[in-house]
Regions:
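Pocket-lining segment of extracytoplasmic ligand-binding domains
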Residues: 107-108, 185-188, 195-289
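C-terminal motif of bacterial Sec signal peptides marking the signal peptidase cleavage site
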Residues: 18-22
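A bilobed periplasmic-binding-protein/Venus flytrap-type ligand-binding module shared by bacterial periplasmic
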Residues: 65, 131-141, 239-255, 310
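Bacterial lipoprotein signal-peptidase II cleavage site
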Residues: 23-35
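Bacterial N-terminal signal peptides that target proteins for export
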Residues: 1-10
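Short, glycine-/small- and polar/acidic-enriched structural segments
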Residues: 41-184, 188-192, 196-203, 223-225, ...
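Secondary-structure end/capping motifs
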Residues: 253-336
Length: 380
């Protein structure tokens, strides 16, 4: 009752103020006074951090585009993009509160939750897997089953899940039937033929091989020199780059709004990279990657292939795709327990996609066709 009484007491004052403002408005405008638009308070910015899965490179071009194009700022977000590295586990960073958003593969999200980590996927950016295992065409290792008893390189720390699943599916126990070699984050072991097979992402390590010269011919290697075993063809192509947060953080309604705005801006960045790959290559170069322009151009192009076309709209994970990855995780020992509910939500990604559609943007890229990108020596 006290609040209502004060409201009525204040009403005459408000009316009087409006009358005074109405009488004096024209004179103030003529005198060059401040307009209502000019006195509008600037939008309050929210600080958030995005932890990348890996170092600065074309794999993350859409986020750099969102930053450089001002999409995050348009959504009232001051975003810090934090590069990853061999000693950085995105899940640990986010669970530790050093970042609100993290990027990693969906099988890693499942594994983290299986171990008690309270993270949830809120957007599945990559619609397909880019992981492969390479052998030399002249090695006679033409099928995944040929890797029994061979030196098989792969990155560890959770990056081995899909390969181990592929080996297991084909009757090869990774712990007993092959010599697993901890692969550095380059292709030197493979190029020097110190391993029989090596892991390679279509957008990164595969290009590193193609950017290298065959010492016998003096020419760059080509795909004809390689056997490429795609995890997607082998039935173990679990989904890769997705955006995750903690359950505790997303439970806050204010953070749910932040998440939707963050996804909207990020998706808009990826749409921009689909339509303007050269610009996005430059944004990555400006951010200071290790490898050169030619390599980043290849990477942006290959990443676009993993995102587009997207039947459900960028970032919105289909139930079928999730079920496939969850089944792979269960069948091949990536997780010990049934993942259950709560691994992912499409609520915020769907809201972001709907907002972008209202702006007239193409969120599915149904007609997308990747251009040809020339391989350059050394990725320069």
């Amino acid at each position: 009752m006290k609040v209502r009484r004060l409201w009525w007491l204040a009403l005459p004052v408000v009316v009087l103020a409006l009358l005074v403002a109405g009488c004096g408005g024209d004179d103030e405008d003529e005198a060059g006074g401040t307009t209502a638009a000019e006195t509008t308070e600037p939008q309050e910015m929210t600080d958030v951090t995005l932890q990348l899965k890996w170092v600065t490179q074309g794999q993350f071009a859409g986020y750099y585009a969102a930053l450089e194009q001002g999409y995050y700022e348009d959504e009232g977000l001051n975003v810090t993009i934090r590069p990853g590295g061999p000693d950085i586990v995105p899940e640990q960073v986010v669970l530790g509160g050093q970042a609100e958003f993290g990027i990693n593969w969906l099988d890693n999200t499942l594994a983290t939750r299986d171990q008690g980590g309270t993270i949830v996927n809120i957007a599945q950016v990559f619609a397909r897997s880019g992981m492969t295992e390479l052998t030399w065409a002249d090695s006679g290792l033409e099928e995944i089953t040929d890797l029994r008893g061979k030196k098989v390189g792969v990155w560890l720390g959770g990056n081995e899940h899909k390969l181990f699943a592929a080996l297991t599916k084909n009757g090869i126990d990774p712990q007993k039937d092959a010599e697993i070699v901890a692969q550095p984050f380059d292709m030197n072991l493979f190029l020097n033929r110190e391993v029989d097979a090596a892991a390679a992402m279509t957008y990164n390590e595969l290009a590193q091989v193609l950017e290298s010269k065959n010492p016998d011919s003096g020419e760059l290697y080509t795909l004809d020199d390689l056997n490429v075993f795609k995890m997607s063809d082998l039935g173990t192509g679990a989904l890769e780059d997705g955006i995750f947060v903690t359950e505790e953080w997303i439970a806050d309604e204010a953070n749910q709004d932040v998440a939707t705005r963050f996804l909207k801006a990020s998706f808009k960045g990826w749409i921009y990279c689909r339509d303007n790959p050269d610009d996005c290559t430059q944004y990555v170069l400006d951010a200071g990657p290790t490898l050169g322009e030619g390599h980043q151009r290849w990477m942006v192009n290959e990443i676009n292939k993993l995102i587009w076309p997207n039947e459900t709209g960028i970032g919105v994970m289909s139930e079928a795709d999730y079920a496939t990855t969850a089944q792979i995780a269960q069948d091949y020992g990536i997780v010990k327990n049934d993942p259950g509910d709560g691994v992912y939500t499409t609520e915020y990604a769907a809201a972001a996609v709907a907002a972008l559609e209202e702006e007239g943007l193409d969120v599915k890229g149904a007609d997308y066709e990747a251009p040809e990108v020339e391989v350059t020596e050394g990725g320069e």
